[in-house]
């Protein structure tokens, strides 16, 4: 079954290229899906192309992450419509931006819900891609909130105003990447110091809890950290995570013909492997460069095979414009969600940056 899925993926890719769907158009189509799935405030969370219906479901964290992808794609593709959508989304989410009564730091809360670290991370990542007039002050406030929620052991609280944790594999990596990108913009030493203090904790956490969910965000964060403060310990950590990701998808240990049968989550993995590849190239590690490069190229092909297009409609002849460019969950489940296109867009943009997506 896995072999058949790979064959399907490559034949779909070849067919799309032959029909004139250029690589540069692919990311634009993925981003355009956002434009075709707007609601009054920002985006519909889910779309069912079979029923031609948007669900009433909401997922604020994933919707904030999609805002980052929309804003970044708008800038990278120089697309005014995407930039306008990003402004619309930011205006919506700004209604949920708050300041702590005692310390004055910024946080995001939707209604009476929990205050997740991931919200602050995506607020920072999104603001960095916008020209919001309050941008600088907001960035400072959100960063202060993350700084104040770092513990003595270097770990980050994943929920503010709570004594329990959740999504440790996700939120800290998202926040570390946000702080590194903010450091790159401001050169504020405290932001770099936070990421450095977090390193031993999350390095040890991964050694004790290896899993694919942890790898993409931490790989991106510590690639960025290495650019500012290089050390072999940090590069070894990025490569340890990259090697683990390869092993999880390459049971034959050939560094090719990877098993990408898990569906749209492949895009998440490619995001981290883009940076692992770039670090291998930077350090002249030819074996990892070749292996990681194969992972990214094959991963992108697998993602593209899941993109709904006129000539890749999964047998669904009667569909609406809202389906075009969307990333389906799998070739058996055609449901579309904002986070699937978010990860696809960012994976492809990252592969373009790495020189792996001509």
Where are these predicted regions, by residue range?
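CBM-like carbohydrate-recognition segments
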Residues: 37-47, 55-59, 99, 251, ...
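Extended, well-ordered alpha-helical scaffold segments
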Residues: 23-34, 78-96, 133-149, 186-205, ...
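Solvent-exposed loop and edge beta-strand segments that line ligand/cofactor-binding
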Residues: 48-64, 103-120, 159-172, 186-188, ...
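Well-ordered alpha-helical scaffold segments within catalytic/enzyme domains
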Residues: 64-80, 121-134, 174-188, 217-231, ...
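Positively charged n-region of N-terminal signal peptides that target proteins for export
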Residues: 1-7
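Bacterial N-terminal signal peptides
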Residues: 9-17
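Active-site cradle of extracellular carbohydrate-active enzymes
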Residues: 35-38, 42-43, 141-174, 178-182, ...
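Low-complexity, Ser/Thr/Pro/Gly-enriched N-terminal "stalk/linker" regions
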Residues: 21-63, 69, 76, 80-104, ...
């Amino acid at each position: 079954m896995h072999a058949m899925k790979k064959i399907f993926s490559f034949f779909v890719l070849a067919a799309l290229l032959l029909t004139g769907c250029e690589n540069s158009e692919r990311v634009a189509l993925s981003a355009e899906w956002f434009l075709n799935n707007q609601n009054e405030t920002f985006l519909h969370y889910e779309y069912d192309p079979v029923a031609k219906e948007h669900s009433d479901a909401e997922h604020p964290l994933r919707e904030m992450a999609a805002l980052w992808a929309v804003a970044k794609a708008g800038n990278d593709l120089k697309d005014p419509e995407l930039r306008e959508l990003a402004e619309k989304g930011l205006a919506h989410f700004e209604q949920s931006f708050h300041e702590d009564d005692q310390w004055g730091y910024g946080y995001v809360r939707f209604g009476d819900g929990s205050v997740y670290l991931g919200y602050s991370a995506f607020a920072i990542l999104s603001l960095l891609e916008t020209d919001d007039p309050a941008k600088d002050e907001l960035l400072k406030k959100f960063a202060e909130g993350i700084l104040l929620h770092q513990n003595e052991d270097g770990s980050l609280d994943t929920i503010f105003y709570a004594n329990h944790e959740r999504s440790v594999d996700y939120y800290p990596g998202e926040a570390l990447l946000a702080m590194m990108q903010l450091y790159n913009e401001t050169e504020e030493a405290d932001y770099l110091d936070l990421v450095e203090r977090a390193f031993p904790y999350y390095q040890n956490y991964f050694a004790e809890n290896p899993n694919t969910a942890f790898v993409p965000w931490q790989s991106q964060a510590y690639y960025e950290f290495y650019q500012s403060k290089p050390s072999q310990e940090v590069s070894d950590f990025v490569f340890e995570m990259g090697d683990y990701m390869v092993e999880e998808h390459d049971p034959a240990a050939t560094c090719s013909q990877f098993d990408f049968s898990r569906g749209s989550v492949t895009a998440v993995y490619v995001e981290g492997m883009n940076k692992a590849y770039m670090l291998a190239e930077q350090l002249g590690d030819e074996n990892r460069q070749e292996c990681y490069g194969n992972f990214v190229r094959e991963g992108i092909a697998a993602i593209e095979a899941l993109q709904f297009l006129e000539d890749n409609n999964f047998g669904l002849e009667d569909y609406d414009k809202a389906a075009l460019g969307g990333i389906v969950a799998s070739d058996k489940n055609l449901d579309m969600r904002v986070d699937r296109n978010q990860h696809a867009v960012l994976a492809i943009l990252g592969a373009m940056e790495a020189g792996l997506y001509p």
